[in-house]
Every structure is written in structure tokens, then in C-alpha cells.
Amino acid sequence: MESLKTDTEMPYPEVIVDVGRVIFGEENRKKMTNSCLKRSENSRIIRAICALLNSGGGVIKAEIDDKTYSYQCHGLGQDLETSFQKLLPSGSQKYLDYMQQGHNLLIFVKSWSPDVFSLPLRICSLRSNLYRRDVTSAINLSASSALELLREKGFRAQRGRPRVKKLHPQQVLNRCIQEEEDMRILASEFFKKDKLMYKEKLNFTESTHVEFKRFTTKKVIPRIKEMLPHYVSAFANTQGGYVLIGVDDKSKEVVGCKWEKVNPDLLKKEIENCIEKLPTFHFCCEKPKVNFTTKILNVYQKDVLDGYVCVIQVEPFCCVVFAEAPDSWIMKDNSVTRLTAEQWVVMMLDTQSAPPSLVTDYNSCLISSASSARKSPGYPIKVHKFKEALQRHLFPVTQEEVQFKPESLCKKLFSDHKELEGLMKTLIHPCSQGIVIFSRSWAGDVGFRKEQNVLCDALLIAVNSPVVLYTILIDPNWPGGLEYARNTAHQLKQKLQTVGGYTGKVCIIPRLIHLSSTQSRPGEIPLRYPRSYRLADEEEMEDLLQALVVVSLSSRSLLSDQMGCEFFNLLIMEQSQLLSESLQKTRELFIYCFPGVRKTALAIKIMEKIKDLFHCKPKEILYVCESDSLKDFVTQQTTCQAVTRKTFMQGEFLKIKHIVMDETENFCSKYGNWYMKAKNITHPKAKGTGSENLHHGILWLFLDPFQIHHADVNGLPPPSAQFPRKTITSGIHCALEIAKVMKEEMKRIKENPPSNMSPDTLALFSETAYEEATCAQALPGVCETKTNLTTEQIANYVARKCHSLFQCGYLPKDIAILCRRGEDRGRYRLALLKAMELIETHRPSEVVFSPATGVWGSHIVLDSIQQFSGLERTVVFGLSPECDQSEEFHKLCFASRAIKHLYLLYEKRAAY
């Protein structure tokens, strides 16, 4: 079979398959006298289409044989159209577009997408080559029927290997009622015979379990090897059966294969070799081979050997047997490559459904070549649920002028490069409805290496336009520009389909631009795509933007972090909605929140729910916390009254009906019993009567059981008395890498519990439940640890990292630098100011550090972890005087205050 290779000469950022010279046109193909050539051309094209469908899409390049050919006048050819329709029964126009460019015909192939209204076929196939018996026919199953069989066999394998019920011959002979099972029993009796007579008539016919074959050709063995795989696959995948070679299927008479044409020993050996080579796929652990028995019966005519009848008994198979490898193709190593049976099954079922051993064996080679058929596991489960809300919030499609996003990065770029904004407005003209999304490197965002010669990339997504990727070069003579732009465009397109789940037709046209010129680079050829690859309307644009949201959330970038924070806010809103359902029936509640839950944000949402549910005035709801910084932050976030525990104990709150207490793990009983005071306010009793409460207000207490600081004097009831209680383990509102740090710390604490932590508290942490929540919600992020540093080295590291973040569009208000001890703040502040001035992160006059009380402001926060309790920022640096195993409790404190980036920096141990 001729190997089809990719074309590297064409400038498209696509996988391009060159199928060679082809005759096109309705009349031209009708006149073809060379039927082999006609079939070969058809086969080359259809295999290439199948491979591209299963590999993220691409372009097929065919050289037109007839120099006078015009696609507009002559069309494709009926045999080609028929093949396309068979491959794509839902309509080939959904996936294929055609364009003539000079003497080449280009076929644009969209990535395969499962039909949401039928069985979710993960890949496209020409033929499954998986057969089943249907009465007297061996049926090559359609892809959907094959998927049903695979699921059925997989389910049965989980319950044990299937068995075939065997009936005794006497039961048949004694019955007056005839049924199909009788034919199987009669065939089994026939199988026991030693010899046959020529023209002997059988007392049974073809059925689900019986197939008759007669060959008049001299080439008996080649014909048997040609047809046998179909029947063995069909019988093995159904209920077993018998193939009788040498019996006329019409007269049911024994005719045999003439003895001079057949060597019985050779025939038996060839049959065994043929069956043993059949591809199989196992769901079971035993993995047996196909079980069959071959028997050669002599056929006599007047006591003289006339020939042979060959009977093959095929037992039902535990799993599935193929007649040959499925006729399904992918792109691999720049070639159109046929899938093996095992690869095909894995992809049909998706690796998440396949046996773990196969995921290990095949996942790595299939992800790159055919991941368009599946969703990537590289994003949390809930991302798709919120992609529309995220898109509408971050990338609203408006009728106004084209928007530039993200705003902070655009502001930085346009400030540093004054001509860039005007250049971009010129480039995108005449687009009037769309979004340009900037990145320091879209290549880095999709998993490629960033290039120093690239100032930035800008992605134009606009109505009535194809998607365009502008690469702004620093050095216009950089020779790697075209390759960089094409590779980035191609990879981003693949991600939109495989990760983002975009099912429409999409192209990304790369354009290289230098700041000094709006012209494309010399030698850059304008790319033409079919009109269907333009975004036709707002709906298509929104669909693509939603796919981009998913792609961005699965990467590490400024855009990802901004989306991630909004994604976590949506998760918190969802969590608060579930939690608020307990407000009516549970007026007092202890809410245990593990690190990463962001309980302050949850507490704020609950106060809003209380106000709406009980129709309260804001002054009737009180929020209580330990620190002034957290109190000030909450005051900015809500209209309800917020105070510290100290203020709460010193004041009177006569109008308060409901109290939400946050960060109670940091409380202490200094100034009095805060818990009883809160309870008396929310559940007051009439003076002197001892009667029941006048009203039942809300008293909800939020705490992190793994960060309790004053267990003996914190004023909380003992853990055994903290009821009713609800434990929130499903909310992980931070980066995956940070969640892993917190999980390991909680696991370590559970294995070596401190004396002040009760066994009941430790039992609440389930590693499995925490991992499930992490998989559902956590996003990619950054966590780095550096040890044995000097103060100067720590300051330089922070300064360099901040400089890098600011270049990418992060703002000072995204960053918190937290010290393990409050007394270290002044020492670190001086070192950081010096380092930041040297590295020119900002101009010296702009370097401002704010204490935790200024968290709502626009400066970098520099304070202790205690003062930052209950607060969080996207980027957190945790500075610790020394790395001491006994002090690693602070790692959990640092991690619980970071959303996407965590940098843990430890000084050298002091010498004594």
C-alpha cells in the first residue's frame, strides 16, 4: 500500500497530506479505463481524509491531472463523492471544503467531532472490520454498532466470561417445535462424523450458527483465507458456530473439495495460521486465544475418495475478534498510518474508559495524533460548566469597536511601545466587532518555547473574519519567525479543538509583523481558506471564545490567572448556594473549611444570602474576625457591619440578629467568652422568664481545623460539642500545584498530629476526597521552593520574579510577600527595595509596599502570614528565616493564602 506523506512546502499552518496526481471531474472519472488506478486514487484520498479527521484536521493537496480542469465547471467525480458520503453519512459538507489553487485541488478537512444526538463516536472509521452474525449473514459492523458491541463485551467481561448454553441432541429429537438452536445442535452432531457421502443431503440449513461454503475455483486455499476471517470474527463475536466448506448452500448437499485440488494437512495448517493471526482485544484479565477446532471429513463416492469437507467449529469469544485491523487512520510521524485493533478500541472507548494497562501503553502515542477525538484530561471537570459565564464576563461580544485584552498587559505594552496600539488598529481594519487577545507568547501559552525575538503575539477573533495570529517581532530579520508563527497557529488551533472542544470549522492565519511596518514579512505568502472558515456571526464567535477560555484555563499565563480567579469566584458562588440551603433549618452551624476553600469569600456570600432570605437590613448582620486587615477587606466587600473579635467583646450590638464569624481558628478567649456572647445575641432569652428564645438568628462559625492556633484558649466549644457541623471538602479554589502542597501538609499533620489537634478533626481529612475535589476544580499554577538562601538572595529572587510578572501584565495588587514572623518585615523590606531598584522593576519612586490592611489597594502587600489571615492574592511569596521540619506548619499557612503562584523561600539556618 502506497505511503502518504505530509507536504512541508505549502505555507499553511496545517497538517498537509500530498496524495499525488489525481484525475478529477465527473466526466473524466467516468471515462477512466484503468479501474485499479481509479480505486487507488479514491483510496488515497479517503484514507487521507480519515487520518486528518482523526488528527485535528488539515489539508489534502492533490495535483490535478487534467490541465484544463476547473473545479467550478467539472466538479469532483461521483465515485469520490460517494466515498465521502459513506465515510461521513451525516453530511460531508460538515467536514470537507474544496478549493482549486492553480493546478492543485485542496481539500480542507475539519477535525472529527462526535455527533451529540447519537452515540459519541470518538473517531472516524472507513470500516470497523468487527463482524457479527445476523441470521445467515456476517455483518461488518458500522462504527456505532461496533461501539455498542465493545461496551456490551466490556460489561460482560466485568461480570465474568460469557458461557454458551449447551443442549443435548435428544431434546431436539423429542420436540415437535423447531427453533434456530436446533440447527446448532444438528451441526454439532454433523461435526462428530468421520466420513460423508457425495451428494449427501444435510438435515439442517444455514443459520445464525451455521455457514455453508462451496468453492469451484482451483485456488481453494487462497479463497478460504480470504473469506474465513469474516466468518470467524462473526461467529466468535456472536454465539459461536460452524463453517462447513464443501457444502452447497442452496441444495444443502455435500460436494466437497476435490482431493486433487486440496492437501488436507496443508489446508488445516493454513486455516490455523489464518485464525491465529486475527487481531483481538481483551477486556478480561485471562486474555485467551480464539478457541476453534478444524476437522477434515473424507467424502466418498461409491466407496472411492472423492474429496474433503472442512468443518471449522468456532467457540464464542470472551471479548472481541477482528477480521483484520480496523480500516481507520491517523497522522503519525508525518504519515497516514493505520490504527491497530487495540489502538482503535482504546480511542473508540476513550482512554478514560479503557483498561489502565492500555492507557499506559497507548496514551502517549495517541494523544498527539488523534486527541481531536477526545477531551484532554489537562483541565478540571467543572471548567466546561462555567465556560459560557466566563466568556461573557471576560470576553463579552459587543457591537462596539474591537476590544484589546487583557487590559493590564495591553496597558504595559502600549506604554513601553508607543506605536504598537496604532499599528494594531491599522492591522485589524476593517474588523469592527471582535476581540484582540494579547500574550507575551501564545507559543508559551500552548506549550511551546517562548522566543526572545518575539515582543508579543496578538490573536484576532472577529465576526466575518478568519482567526488571525499576529506575531510582533523585535528583530525583523529573525529567520525562525515563519516557523514559530506557523507552529504556534497550528498548535493553538489543535488546542481549541482538543482541549476547548470547539466543533466548528476554524483556521488560524499567522502573520509576522515588525513594529516599524504594517506590511507582512517578505516572502510571506497570503493564505486563502474557504469562506466557511470565517466566523459568520456573534454566536460562532462566542463558541470559539468559550473554547479559548477552556484552553487558557489549562495553561499558565496572565490570561489564565485572570480567568482562574473568576472561575474560582463562580465555584464559590455555587458552593455558597449549596451551603445556604441549610440557613432555614440550621440556625447555628460550625463550618469546617479545609485549606484552599477560601472561606472568607464563602462567608461574604453567605451574609448576602442571609440578607436576601430573611429580608434583613445590612446593620442587622454582623461579621466578626480576628484581624483589622481582614475586617477592612470585608468592609469593602459587603454592606454588612464588620468588626474584630476585640471590638465585638468591647461593644454592644443591640440591632444585630445574625452573626457570621470567620477565621475562628485564630480566636482566643482574651477579653471574654466570645462564643457565648454571640450565641446570646443570636438566641436571646426574655429576661427573668426562662422562656424560649424570642427569635432564632443565624450563628455560623467558619474555621479551618488544620490551622487552629490556640486550641486550649480559643474560646470554641470542644470538637465533640461543635454540632451541628458541616465539613466542606469539595471546594479547592487554587492552583493544582498549591493544592498538592496543602494535601501533603495535611497528610503529614494527620500522620504526626500535634497535641492540640483532636482525633475527630484529623479523621475529617480524606486524601481521596481531597484529590477528587482537586481534579474537579484545581487549575494549573506554579509552586517553587528554594532553600538555604541569604536575605539578599531571597530579595533578588523576589525582585526578578516580580519583574518577569510585571512584564507579562501582572500588577502590584496581584502580589503578596508574606513573612513567617512579623518582626522580619522591616528587614526584608529594605532588602527588597534595594533589589527591585537594581533590577528596574519599577522606577525607585514607584516601589511601594503596603501592610495587609492595604490589601484592597494597588500595591504589593508585605506583611506577616498572621496579619494576612483570611486574605489571598494571585501570587504569594512566603519568606521564612530557616527551613525547619518542626516549623513546616507555616507551609500550609503560606499555601492557603495563594491562588495561582506560590514561591516558598527559606533562609540559611543561623550558625551558633
Curated annotation (Swiss-Prot):
InterPro entries: P-loop_NTPase, Poxin-SLFN/SLFN_N, Schlafen, Schlafen_AlbA_2_dom, Schlafen_AlbA_2_dom_sf, SLFN_GTPase-like. Expressed in megakaryocytes and platelets (at protein level). Weakly expressed in melanocytes and malignant melanoma cells. Changing residue 249 to A: Abolishes endoribonuclease activity. It is an enzyme of class 3 (hydrolase). Keywords: ATP-binding, Disease variant, Endonuclease, Hydrolase, Nuclease, Nucleotide-binding, Nucleus. It comes from the Eukaryota. C-terminally truncated SLFN14 endoribonuclease requires manganese and magnesium for its endoribonuclease activity. GO terms for molecular function: ATP binding; ribosome binding; RNA endonuclease activity. This is Protein SLFN14. It comes from Homo sapiens (Human).
